[in-house]
A protein has these predicted regions:
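Short alpha-helical hairpin
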Residues: 2-20
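N-terminal glycine-rich anion-binding loops that anchor highly charged ligand groups
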Residues: 11, 33-35, 53-57
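Active-site flanking loop/helix segments enriched in acidic
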Residues: 16-34, 67-72
Length: 192
């Protein structure tokens, strides 16, 4: 059954169902709902901007973007963004997805915390970042209607203390490898 949230649906495909199942089984409820909101906000931004893209690739990029914060997919020495991108790459490769499409998703995830660059790249890369920036930072908040924002959050609720909870989740996912945060926004998460 396909659920419509603010006029956006998750792709009705075997690949999307497997992505949902894997993310639900691997990530916390907080990250699952955050990643889902990222997808809806990203797709709404794409619709508003008139961008053309493969919705399955966008869904994969959004749902895997924080996978590198999980114990299962966290390496000892790579940035969490790269760990998440590698997890998506391995998953998509196992499903026979083309290398070109894998590279798009990998790049979208690897750059999702690098402001200013993704907006100049492939629509999937730009939109994953746009969805993340809206859900975590509220960037472009006014570009979404009250109805859209409410529908997304109703379908995938925020915790009562989302800001503190997501920062704690970032901290827990990267504290064992502080050197990977040098020169990026996650350095602030580890700062005392």
């Amino acid at each position: 059954m396909t659920v419509n949230v603010a006029g956006i649906t998750v792709p009705d495909s075997q690949l999307a169902r497997e992505i949902t199942e894997l993310v639900r089984d691997t990530e916390s409820e907080l990250l699952f709902h955050h990643s889902s909101r990222v997808y809806y906000f990203a797709a709404l931004a794409g619709q508003r901007r008139g961008l053309r893209y493969d919705p399955e690739l966008l869904y994969c990029g959004c749902m895997f973007h924080d996978m590198g914060l999980t114990h299962r997919h966290s390496s000892a020495c790579e940035r969490f963004e790269v760990d998440g991108a590698n997890a998506a790459r391995d998953f998509l490769k196992s499903k026979g997805i083309s290398q070109q499409d894998i590279d798009i998703v990998w790049t979208a995830i690897a750059l999702h915390t690098t402001p200013g660059i993704p907006k100049h790249m492939h629509p999937v890369v730009a939109l994953v970042t746009a969805g993340v920036e809206m859900d975590v930072l509220g960037l472009a908040y006014q570009e979404y209607s009250d109805v859209e924002r409410d529908a997304v959050v109703r379908a995938h609720p925020r915790t009562p203390h989302f800001k503190e909870d997501i920062i704690q989740t970032f901290y827990d996912g990267i504290r064992h490898k502080p050197d990977t945060t040098f020169g990026n926004v996650k350095a602030d998460v580890l700062a005392d």
